[in-house]
From Swiss-Prot:
Record-given protein name: Glycerol-3-phosphate acyltransferase 1
EC category name: transferase
Signal peptide annotation: none
Enzyme Commission number(s) of this protein: 2.3.1.275
Functional summary from the UniProt entry: Catalyzes the transfer of an acyl group from acyl-phosphate (acyl-PO(4)) to glycerol-3-phosphate (G3P) to form lysophosphatidic acid (LPA). This enzyme utilizes acyl-phosphate as fatty acyl donor, but not acyl-CoA or acyl-ACP.
Keyword field contains Membrane: yes
Record-stated family: Belongs to the PlsY family.
């Protein structure tokens, strides 16, 4: 049985969590629309600075660019954490931090994206086998529901089960469940 001290974080980890949150504040949609059109995407379409709104307002190319930018952001945070700290529980905590930074960015007064792209990129970097398993789950639900939103949210909700199936610790699994609750909450609003 692990001791409570095993889950304490040191000052370097704390600084990395803060940096992860701040890195999450970089909103690809905002940067792209400011650069290309000199507008704030939060004033366009649904007002959400995410890939889906970019696709609706500016087309598929903007959707792809925004998705990739936000996904890479999550992947960078998780990849560096895996390299530096080698603790899956802490790495999952960094994924939560970057997603929190994306959804509730301090730089944008708490009005960010919905976190799905950042989550996907971070999850692929965390464990590509879990990501592939969830892709298979998504395909099954996509064939049943013939849409993206419902199958996507159902698939995301399956993450904690995958964490258990792939033998991650209970604490890491609980952190993954917190991420899912956050994403489902934000996407329900």
């Amino acid at each position: 049985m692990q001791k409570v001290n095993d889950y304490m974080i040191n000052s370097m980890q704390f600084l990395y969590l803060v940096a992860s949150y701040l890195f999450g504040n970089i909103l690809t949609a905002y940067i792209v629309t400011k650069w290309r059109h000199n507008v704030d995407i939060r004033d366009e379409g649904s007002g959400n600075p995410g890939a889906r709104n970019m696709g609706r307002v500016y087309g598929k190319g903007y959707f792809v660019a925004t998705f990739l930018g936000d996904a890479i952001k999550g992947a960078i945070v998780v990849s560096i954490a895996k390299y530096l700290f080698e603790d899956f529980t802490f790495v999952m905590l960094t994924l939560l931090a970057v997603i929190m930074g994306h959804i509730y960015p301090m730089l944008f007064k708490g009005k960010g994206g919905k976190g799905i792209s950042t989550f996907i990129g971070g999850l692929i970097a965390f464990d590509y086998l879990i990501a592939l398993t969830l892709v298979a789950v998504f395909i099954i639900f996509y064939l049943i529901f013939k849409g993206f939103t419902k199958p996507g949210l159902i698939t995301i909700a399956c993450l904690p089960l995958c964490m258990i199936l792939y033998s991650y610790s209970i604490v890491t699994t609980i952190l993954s469940a917190l991420i899912i609750v956050l994403i489902l909450y934000v996407n329900h609003e």
